[in-house]
From Swiss-Prot:
InterPro entries named among the record's database cross-references: Kunitz_BPTI, Kunitz_BPTI_sf, Prtase_inh_Kunz-CS, TFPI/VKTCI-like
Name of the protein in its database record: Kunitz-type serine protease inhibitor TCI
UniProt function note: Serine protease inhibitor that strongly inhibits chymotrypsin (Ki=84.6 nM) and trypsin (Ki=391 nM).
CDD domains: Kunitz_textilinin-like
UniProt KW keywords: Disulfide bond, Protease inhibitor, Secreted, Serine protease inhibitor, Signal
Main location group: secreted
Listed SUPFAM superfamilies: BPTI-like
S-S pairs: 31-81, 40-64, 56-77
GO molecular-function terms, A-Z: serine-type endopeptidase inhibitor activity
Length: 83
């Protein structure tokens, strides 16, 4: 195979790897939990992973209760649930 074809094949494989969605196999189970504001009245902007949108989204946390799918920053949410 010529070097031009190998380079084209490598480029196509790289593109495919970048565009193929990552499966949730390595994602913690709590990332699948819904956003829960909790039962207190605080106003704490937070982030959760929305599996339907495959993205981290903002929500308001009340300060107590809730579940593990709650992050202080969108970066923390991405590191944990998106990969």
């Amino acid at each position: 195979m010529s070097s031009g074809r190998l380079l084209l094949l490598l480029g196509l494989l790289t593109l495919w790897a970048e565009l193929t969605p990552v499966s949730g196999l390595g994602r913690p189970k709590f990332c699948e939990l819904p956003a829960v504001s909790g039962f207190c009245k605080a106003y704490i902007p937070s982030f959760y992973y929305n599996p339907d949108a495959s993205a981290c989204q903002k929500f308001i946390y009340g300060g107590c209760g809730g579940n593990a799918n709650k992050f202080k920053t969108i970066e923390e949410c991405h590191r944990t649930c998106v990969g």
